[in-house]
Amino acid sequence: VNPVLEAHGLVKRYGHVTALNGVDFELLPGEILAVIGDNGAGKSSLIKALSGALIPDEGQILLDGKPVHFHNPADARRAGIETVYQDLAVAPALDIAANLFLGREVRRKGVLGTVFRLLDTKRMEAESSAHMQDLKIGINAMSQSVETLSGGQRQGVAVARGAAFARHVVIMDEPTAALGVKESGMVLDLIREVRERGLPVILISHDIPTVFDVADRVHIQRLGRRVAVVRPGDVDMAEAVAIMAGAAPGKFTGSE
């Protein structure tokens, strides 16, 4: 199976600190791939490189087998890679539909849209409602403001936005970080729904039980390198943590 998104030999230095030290990466079609590692392992730098927020000093990124060069997140979005950030990046004062189309607003047809710049709110609300139903997110009124939603529902809006516009990959950065058990479960169900729609997901998480619950494969970072790719069925959580900490050797049971 050919990877949807891959990287070879990524290097990123910040002065004397090497954040990425020749990292390889493969995301396969239709999978949830978790990326784990201690602080300083290079998780954030890797994800920033894949999402266009950081330009690596060396190495290559390929999308569907073709080399890509992202200079900013907009380049990655245009290529079909959407990122749902840890800080949610939703606008609390705006309604759900406006949040889903943030930066991609649909204008009314004709003079009303081109001259007066009026938004086609009905179309945006209808499409938002369809996206939310697709992902089985139980919010009915697209006109309610995001600040009235629970943490899990807000995360749902952010995930729906990513899934609505991604053509190739959805990257989720700590999507359950600030949520309780019930809301975390809801977001994990959402992540599975995104995969069911055929979009592969990259999941960055510190929460190892969550990773083992939802991921098909786990990419383990340590000291700026990829030291393992494992399937949750092949190793237990304790071994994954030991590999992450350098107390156990790396292994690649999940690379086929």
Regions found by a protein language model. Give the residues of each.
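Glycine-rich phosphate-binding loops of nucleotide-dependent enzymes
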Residues: 1-256
